Protein backbone atom coordinates (compact mmCIF):
# COMPACT_ATOMS: atom_id res chain seq x y z
CA UNK A 1 0.00 0.00 0.00
CA UNK A 2 1.30 3.42 -0.98
CA UNK A 3 0.85 6.07 1.70
CA UNK A 4 0.37 9.59 0.37
CA UNK A 5 2.60 12.26 1.87
CA UNK A 6 1.01 14.23 4.68
CA UNK A 7 -0.27 17.61 3.53
CA UNK A 8 -2.30 20.26 5.31
CA UNK A 9 -3.85 23.63 4.65
CA UNK A 10 -1.73 26.62 5.56
CA UNK A 11 -4.19 28.43 7.86
CA UNK A 12 -3.26 26.66 11.09
CA UNK A 13 0.48 26.91 10.60
CA UNK A 14 0.13 30.61 9.73
CA UNK A 15 -1.85 31.22 12.93
CA UNK A 16 0.68 29.24 14.99
CA UNK A 17 3.61 31.06 13.39
CA UNK A 18 2.02 34.45 14.00
CA UNK A 19 1.55 33.58 17.67
CA UNK A 20 5.18 32.50 18.11
CA UNK A 21 6.50 35.63 16.39
CA UNK A 22 4.21 37.86 18.48
CA UNK A 23 5.46 36.27 21.70
CA UNK A 24 9.11 36.49 20.62
CA UNK A 25 8.85 40.12 19.60
CA UNK A 26 7.22 40.94 22.96
CA UNK A 27 9.80 39.04 25.04
CA UNK A 28 12.50 40.89 23.12
CA UNK A 29 11.52 44.19 24.73
CA UNK A 30 11.03 42.92 28.29
CA UNK A 31 14.57 43.97 29.40
CA UNK A 32 13.42 47.59 29.06
CA UNK A 33 11.08 47.04 32.01
CA UNK A 34 14.12 46.49 34.27
CA UNK A 35 15.70 49.86 33.52
CA UNK A 36 15.96 52.18 36.51
CA UNK A 37 15.91 55.94 36.49
CA UNK A 38 19.39 57.48 36.82
CA UNK A 39 20.44 59.44 39.89
CA UNK A 40 19.66 62.79 38.25
CA UNK A 41 16.08 61.65 37.52
CA UNK A 42 16.27 62.71 33.87
CA UNK A 43 14.68 60.62 31.12
CA UNK A 44 17.28 61.92 28.65
CA UNK A 45 20.03 60.47 30.83
CA UNK A 46 18.18 57.16 30.94
CA UNK A 47 18.18 57.04 27.14
CA UNK A 48 21.80 58.13 26.72
CA UNK A 49 23.10 55.70 29.32
CA UNK A 50 21.23 52.84 27.65
CA UNK A 51 21.65 53.90 24.02
CA UNK A 52 23.29 50.61 23.01
CA UNK A 53 20.48 48.60 24.59
CA UNK A 54 17.75 50.70 22.95
CA UNK A 55 19.58 50.52 19.61
CA UNK A 56 20.07 46.76 19.72
CA UNK A 57 16.51 46.03 20.81
CA UNK A 58 15.08 48.35 18.17
CA UNK A 59 17.21 46.79 15.43
CA UNK A 60 16.19 43.27 16.44
CA UNK A 61 12.52 44.29 16.69
CA UNK A 62 12.58 45.75 13.18
CA UNK A 63 14.40 42.72 11.76
CA UNK A 64 11.92 40.27 13.32
CA UNK A 65 9.08 42.39 11.91
CA UNK A 66 10.68 42.22 8.45
CA UNK A 67 11.11 38.45 8.77
CA UNK A 68 7.43 38.24 9.70
CA UNK A 69 6.48 40.20 6.57
CA UNK A 70 8.58 37.81 4.49
CA UNK A 71 6.92 34.81 6.16
CA UNK A 72 3.49 36.19 5.33
CA UNK A 73 4.51 36.88 1.73
CA UNK A 74 5.63 33.27 1.42
CA UNK A 75 2.60 31.63 3.00
CA UNK A 76 0.15 33.87 1.15
CA UNK A 77 1.27 32.12 -2.04
CA UNK A 78 1.16 28.59 -0.61
CA UNK A 79 -1.78 26.23 -1.18
CA UNK A 80 -0.79 23.36 1.10
CA UNK A 81 1.90 22.55 3.64
CA UNK A 82 3.75 19.23 3.50
CA UNK A 83 5.80 17.71 6.29
CA UNK A 84 9.24 19.03 5.17
CA UNK A 85 7.87 22.57 4.89
CA UNK A 86 6.24 22.24 8.30
CA UNK A 87 9.51 21.16 9.93
CA UNK A 88 11.42 23.94 8.17
CA UNK A 89 8.86 26.39 9.55
CA UNK A 90 9.27 24.94 13.06
CA UNK A 91 13.05 25.38 12.75
CA UNK A 92 12.52 28.98 11.59
CA UNK A 93 10.19 29.65 14.53
CA UNK A 94 12.71 28.13 16.95
CA UNK A 95 15.35 30.54 15.65
CA UNK A 96 12.92 33.47 15.89
CA UNK A 97 11.92 32.51 19.44
CA UNK A 98 15.60 32.49 20.48
CA UNK A 99 16.32 35.89 18.91
CA UNK A 100 16.17 37.60 22.36
CA UNK A 101 19.29 35.61 23.35
CA UNK A 102 21.75 37.02 20.76
CA UNK A 103 20.09 40.41 21.16
CA UNK A 104 20.71 40.36 24.92
CA UNK A 105 24.30 39.22 24.38
CA UNK A 106 25.06 41.99 21.89
CA UNK A 107 23.46 44.73 24.02
CA UNK A 108 25.06 43.66 27.31
CA UNK A 109 28.63 43.03 26.14
CA UNK A 110 31.44 44.75 24.28
CA UNK A 111 31.36 44.53 20.48
CA UNK A 112 33.85 41.70 20.02
CA UNK A 113 33.96 39.54 16.90
CA UNK A 114 32.32 36.64 18.76
CA UNK A 115 29.52 38.76 20.20
CA UNK A 116 28.61 40.61 16.99
CA UNK A 117 29.31 37.53 14.87
CA UNK A 118 26.89 35.46 16.93
CA UNK A 119 24.23 38.19 16.66
CA UNK A 120 24.52 38.63 12.89
CA UNK A 121 25.07 34.91 12.33
CA UNK A 122 21.82 34.13 14.12
CA UNK A 123 19.95 36.48 11.80
CA UNK A 124 21.69 34.85 8.83
CA UNK A 125 20.42 31.48 10.08
CA UNK A 126 16.84 32.77 10.26
CA UNK A 127 17.12 34.18 6.74
CA UNK A 128 18.65 30.95 5.42
CA UNK A 129 15.79 28.91 6.87
CA UNK A 130 13.31 31.24 5.17
CA UNK A 131 15.15 30.77 1.87
CA UNK A 132 15.06 26.99 2.31
CA UNK A 133 11.30 27.16 2.93
CA UNK A 134 10.82 29.15 -0.27
CA UNK A 135 13.12 26.83 -2.22
CA UNK A 136 11.15 23.78 -1.08
CA UNK A 137 7.79 25.44 -1.74
CA UNK A 138 8.85 26.35 -5.29
CA UNK A 139 10.05 22.87 -6.21
CA UNK A 140 7.63 20.52 -4.38
CA UNK A 141 4.52 19.68 -6.46
CA UNK A 142 1.27 21.30 -5.37
CA UNK A 143 2.60 23.64 -2.70
CA UNK A 144 2.71 26.68 -4.99
CA UNK A 145 0.91 27.14 -8.29
CA UNK A 146 3.34 26.96 -11.26
CA UNK A 147 2.09 30.30 -12.57
CA UNK A 148 2.99 31.89 -9.22
CA UNK A 149 6.46 30.34 -9.26
CA UNK A 150 7.10 31.51 -12.84
CA UNK A 151 5.56 34.97 -12.47
CA UNK A 152 7.70 38.07 -12.18
CA UNK A 153 6.55 38.51 -8.57
CA UNK A 154 7.49 34.90 -7.84
CA UNK A 155 10.94 35.26 -9.38
CA UNK A 156 11.43 38.59 -7.59
CA UNK A 157 10.56 36.97 -4.26
CA UNK A 158 13.09 34.21 -4.88
CA UNK A 159 15.87 36.64 -5.77
CA UNK A 160 14.95 38.83 -2.79
CA UNK A 161 15.26 35.90 -0.41
CA UNK A 162 18.64 34.89 -1.85
CA UNK A 163 19.96 38.46 -1.70
CA UNK A 164 18.78 39.05 1.88
CA UNK A 165 20.48 35.85 3.03
CA UNK A 166 23.59 36.83 1.07
CA UNK A 167 23.74 40.23 2.78
CA UNK A 168 23.46 38.65 6.22
CA UNK A 169 26.27 36.21 5.39
CA UNK A 170 28.47 39.04 4.10
CA UNK A 171 27.83 41.09 7.25
CA UNK A 172 28.56 37.99 9.33
CA UNK A 173 32.03 37.75 7.77
CA UNK A 174 32.53 41.50 8.27
CA UNK A 175 31.51 41.13 11.94
CA UNK A 176 34.19 38.50 12.47
CA UNK A 177 36.86 40.71 10.89
CA UNK A 178 35.82 44.16 12.14
CA UNK A 179 33.01 43.92 14.71
CA UNK A 180 32.92 47.63 15.54
CA UNK A 181 30.18 49.11 13.38
CA UNK A 182 29.60 45.89 11.42
CA UNK A 183 25.83 46.07 11.91
CA UNK A 184 25.75 49.29 9.87
CA UNK A 185 26.43 47.12 6.84
CA UNK A 186 22.95 45.65 7.32
CA UNK A 187 21.80 48.80 5.53
CA UNK A 188 22.88 46.99 2.37
CA UNK A 189 19.44 45.37 2.64
CA UNK A 190 18.03 48.63 1.26
CA UNK A 191 19.49 47.70 -2.13
CA UNK A 192 17.86 44.26 -2.20
CA UNK A 193 14.43 45.15 -3.62
CA UNK A 194 15.62 47.11 -6.69
CA UNK A 195 18.25 44.47 -7.50
CA UNK A 196 15.73 41.63 -7.10
CA UNK A 197 13.24 43.45 -9.34
CA UNK A 198 15.89 43.95 -12.00
CA UNK A 199 16.96 40.30 -11.90
CA UNK A 200 13.32 39.15 -12.13
CA UNK A 201 12.79 41.15 -15.34
CA UNK A 202 15.54 39.29 -17.17
Question: In which residue ranges do the predicted regions lie?
Answer:
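Multi-pass alpha-helical transmembrane bundle typical of ion/small-solute transporters
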Residues: 1-202
Amino acid sequence: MIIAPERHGSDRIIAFSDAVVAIAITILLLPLADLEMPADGKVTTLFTENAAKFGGLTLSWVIIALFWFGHHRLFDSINIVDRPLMWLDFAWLFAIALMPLPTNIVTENDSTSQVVGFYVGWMALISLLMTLMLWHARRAPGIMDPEVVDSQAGREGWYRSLLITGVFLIVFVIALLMPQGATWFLLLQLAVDPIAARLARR
